[in-house]
Design a protein with these regions (language model features):
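N-terminal domain-onset segments
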Residues: 1-85, 221-224, 231, 237, ...
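Interaction-surface and assembly-scaffold signal
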Residues: 2-9, 116-258
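Generic hydrophobic/packing signal
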Residues: 32, 41-43, 92-93, 107, ...
Length: 258
């Protein structure tokens, strides 16, 4: 099946590839229990489609799956087609027969309406709306996620500290390959990125905290907090924490799997 060249979102025609011309990003990688990843995916709305595609959590020795938590701030500049916004992501590595190891984005809250619609309708990214604060990029990012109207309070806090890390020199070419569900079908989503102004802190630098009140009221925030708790991310030591002051990317049209 051929990939689309464009799609209309909220009355606007969006042409692929979709550019990100200016953003900053901070994140951390973890090893988490594959059995918990499997259980979280099975409880989600996309589980039947992912099962039919044969997707399974990557299981390293000890039954562990690589995971990432990330905070991205998209800047208010011309050329950022989806606008200026924050997003916080939780993603896992899955094996998909015939496609190797792909990343599955499990949660992707954002703080603006248009990117929420675009992420879901263009690529099947599981975006929902919350309030977020934080810098992203730089050597210290105190990212906070809460319900709409909370100014980031009462949800999940993600502190990413690379101040004692090592600089990553020059420009880094990065690639993203995801498996998501779009219009009831499994799709592969790819992006090519370039990042500069990086720092890396091995074996530490991240602290994930579930704030008081995270389980009360907002169902999306409560679900995110429960996933953090079940995965043990609020107790885990990061494999590495990273930040990039400058991040540019192009997101390609989704490709049907199978």
């Amino acid at each position: 099946m051929s990939s689309p060249t464009s799609r209309v979102v909220a009355g606007r025609e969006i042409t692929f590839p979709v550019p990100v011309v200016s953003a900053s990003v901070s994140g951390a990688a973890f090893l988490i229990r594959a059995a918990v990843v499997r259980r979280l995916i099975a409880a989600g709305r996309q589980s039947a489609v992912l099962d039919a595609a044969g997707a399974e959590p990557v299981a390293l020795p000890g039954g562990r799956t690589p995971a990432i938590m990330i905070h991205v701030r998209y800047h208010d500049v011309p050329g950022n087609v989806l606008g200026a916004y924050h997003e916080m992501g939780l993603a896992f590595q899955l094996k998909v027969p015939g496609h190797g190891t792909l990343v599955h984005i499990h949660e992707l809250p954002v703080d603006q309406d248009f990117t929420l619609a675009a992420g879901n309708e263009l690529w099947g990214f599981p975006k929902w709306k919350g309030d977020m604060v934080g810098t992203a990029g730089g050597a210290l990012d105190d990212a906070r996620l809460g319900a709409v109207g909370s100014a980031g309070a009462g949800g999940v806090d993600l502190r990413l500290d690379t101040r004692v890390g090592v600089p990553i020199p020059g420009s880094q070419s990065l690639a993203m390959n995801c498996v998501q569900v779009l219009d009831g079908q499994p799709v592969r989503v790819t992006a090519e990125a370039n990042a500069r102004g990086g720092r890396m802190r091995p074996l530490s630098g991240a602290r994930v905290t579930i704030a008081p009140g995270a389980d009360d009221g907002n169902a999306d925030v409560a679900r995110f907090a429960e996933a953090v708790r079940e995965l043990g991310l609020d107790r885990a030591r990061a494999l590495a924490t990273f930040s990039y002051d400058t991040f540019e990317a192009e997101f390609q049209a989704p490709e049907r799997i199978g």
